[in-house]
A protein has these predicted regions:
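C-terminal transmembrane module of eukaryotic multi-pass membrane proteins
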Residues: 191-274
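Symmetry-related core transmembrane helices of the 12-TM Major Facilitator Superfamily/SLC fold
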Residues: 29-47, 254-271
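Cationic, low-complexity basic patches in intrinsically disordered or flexible, solvent-exposed regions
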Residues: 333
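Glycine-rich segments within core transmembrane alpha-helices of 12-TM secondary carriers
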Residues: 1-17, 122-132, 230-244
Length: 356
């Protein structure tokens, strides 16, 4: 929605200005003033948001220990395999947010109002992201049966189509300088331009939603470190792509994207099929119906107060406690009052036959 709203705003500002493909100082002041004001308002809203009704117990790790565990996790086999996925999202992000809009702006055969075209391209990308998000959200549980890897493969196919269309629609120098040249196969035109923008947003949503889902599922007990590594690779490769993009013609940038997209899709499928799914099959829950346990472990305060006890009793009565849940809890409880919580935990799950 943010891309759609921003695109509509930019279109109104650019379309009402007197210039065609140049931005006047008056327009610059309007844009910077509006976006600065909105950023301040957003920061204030975030600052005054209500706190949650309870405080979670903080981990007893120093910043140095937390940083060390993040670096150790960075070189594990799982993270090295997923690094290709994270890197691709960074390069792809630099393309649809920076390089592709530059191609639109520098391709003079599209017309004189290229700034307005940029705004409409933002709307098209936002619509692509929104529609992909709605489809994935509506499917919901069906996604788990379909498989995350199939959604990622769909996003990969969509992105590959975008890269091929970009090559056909834009001249080689469009990513570097203004040009009057035609595309490699046809004259640049707006319908194809907006279609590419829509598909870039659609594919980006397919990739990112499934990456977030994968990380939350596979590394729920180390979510902070995992997302830090994800952003490290994504932002690092996005920054690197912006550095080398002024020196590469469009076809070479697209070639890099195609290579990375194929390897990223392969890495995602390998991780999902040969690491995560076999592990889950070993720890699959029993088929008896009953109450699910929470996804997070009990805190010390909940163990001590007994607020968690009834829930464990109810779940245990249906035999819904799984090895996977207990393993995940154990990992998260290492830095809490372990003995107190686990004594309460196992006493409730396996009560003594001798009553008081």
């Amino acid at each position: 929605m943010s891309l759609i709203g921003a695109g509509i705003f930019l279109y109104i500002v650019f379309h009402s200005s007197d210039t065609t493909d140049k931005i006047s100082m008056k327009t610059v002041r309007i844009l910077y003033g509006t976006f600065t004001g909105m950023a301040i308002v957003a920061a204030l809203i975030l600052l005054f948001l209500r706190r949650p009704p309870y405080e979670k117990k903080k981990m007893n790790q120093s910043y140095g220990e937390l940083l060390g565990s993040t670096f150790r996790m960075l070189i594990t086999q799982e993270m090295l395999l997923l690094a290709v996925v994270f890197a691709y999202t960074g390069i792809e992000q630099s393309y649809w947010t920076g390089i592709y809009p530059t191609c639109i702006s520098f391709t003079q055969q599209l017309g004189n109002h290229t700034n307005s075209y940029l705004a409409l391209n933002s709307v098209a990308s936002g619509l692509g992201q929104m529609i992909a998000g709605l489809i994935i959200g509506i499917l919901g549980d069906h996604i788990r049966r379909i498989g995350r890897e199939k959604i990622v493969l769909l996003g990969t196919i969509v992105h590959l189509a975008c890269f091929v269309l970009s090559y056909m629609n834009f001249p080689s120098r469009a990513s570097i300088e203004k040009t009057d040249s035609s595309g490699h196969l046809w004259t640049p035109n707006l319908p194809v331009t907006y279609t590419i923008g829509f598909l870039l947003g659609f594919g980006d949503a397919c990739w990112n939603t499934q990456i977030y889902s994968l990380l939350c599922d596979a590394f729920s007990h180390k979510s902070s470190q995992t997302f830090a590594i994800f952003k490290f690779w994504q932002c690092g490769l996005s920054s690197a792509a912006f550095f080398y993009s002024p020196y590469l013609e469009l076809q070479w940038y697209l070639l890099i994207l195609i290579i990375f997209s194929v390897f990223a899709a392969a890495s995602f499928v390998l991780f999902e099929q040969f690491w995560l799914k076999p592990y889950k099959r070993k720890v699959a829950p029993m088929q008896n119906k009953g109450t699910e346990l929470p996804s997070s472990p009990p805190s010390y305060s909940s163990c001590a107060s007994g607020s968690f006890s009834e829930h464990i009793k109810e779940a245990a009565s249906y035999k819904r406690v799984t090895i996977f849940q207990m393993d995940r809890w154990d990992s998260q409880l290492l830095n809490q009052d372990f003995l107190t919580c686990m004594n309460s935990y196992f006493a409730l799950l396996f009560p003594s036959p001798i009553s008081n």
